[in-house]
Amino acid sequence: MRVLFFLFCLLNFVFANEITTPIKEIEASANVLGTTLINGKLFIATDGGTVEIYDPKESKFDEIIKMDDIKTYVSDHERPKILNVDELNGKMLILSEGDYATKVLYIRENGQMRSIKMANQATKKALFLDDERVALASISNEIYFLNLKSGEIYDSFKISIAMLSDMEISEDRGTLAIACESGKVYFYNILAKKMDRILDIHTDNIYDIAYKNGVMISGGTDRIAGIFSAGTLKKINTGFLVYGVGLSSDGKIAAYMSDEMSDVNLVDSVTLDKITMLKTGQSTINSIVFISDNEVVTSAYEKKILFWRVR
């Protein structure tokens, strides 16, 4: 009897660290390519040519922006994939597919949309530096700086011969964190035009990074989640490819996809102590976003987006 009681208590302890049911589920109009939280709103990029803005506090969609159809070599009416979205001071940036496998940068302000042609069609990500400047990252690991008024590139540099994986920017828009196929993460000081730090984290390609409050987490092919916090780099061996990662706004809680079931582990970014596991049941996770320290959003290449209460 004592043995059975002990096993019951042990199982309760184990499963208490797992969350199996989300508090809320919403559905985008098309498969989700990524999500990002900006000023408390969830910006959802889809492969159906839409940017869908959801207000978590009000539990409703504020707006759905639908891009025009594009032409391909097989059809004159295809929906463009939205590659990424950013927003600053009421101005929105949308990096989208264009006609015949091109890329188009759209700037939306006061309800008006304008497009900017880009010479480099290998652009993978775009982020605001300020109201008039944008950083563009190409898959060939070149970073370009674009003046929105003139539409001209005013500066650029190449990081390495390795392909670019991902790019994020600090809250003050002063530092770019750039992840590469080589497994390294570069921290570029925009004002000083120099690398402040280079971290050699992974032995192979990096899938995803998050960068909040000076803390960085990366996930890669080598089944490692790397966390740089308080000047120290720590590594977690997950045993599976780490496709998606995320951080709370203060950087104190780190999250990463941990296995083939798309479970998401949440840990203390300094001690690496486990906080909980989210049993998402989704396909491969492509973004993990913290609404707050207590609420996390997970998405995958599907319409379903899940909200989780973690504390």
Region annotations inferred by a language model:
Residues 46-47, 97-99, 137-140, 179-182, ...:
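Conserved strand-to-loop turn within each blade of WD40 beta-propeller repeats
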Residues 24-49:
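Beta-strand-rich domains and repeat architectures in extracellular enzymes and scaffolds
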Residues 56-59, 107-111, 147-151, 189-193, ...:
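Short loop/turn segments that connect beta-strands within beta-propeller blades
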Residues 37-39, 87-89, 129-131, 171-172, ...:
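Residue-level detector of Asp-centered blade-edge/turn motifs that repeat once per structural unit
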Residues 52, 103-106, 144, 186, ...:
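WD40 beta-propeller blade core
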Residues 42, 92-93, 134-135, 176, ...:
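Hydrophobic beta-strand positions that form the internal "hydrophobic ladder"
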Residues 21-27, 60-75, 111-117, 152-158, ...:
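A short beta-strand motif characteristic of beta-propeller blades
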Residues 35, 83-85, 125-126, 167, ...:
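Hydrophobic core register within WD40 beta-propeller blades
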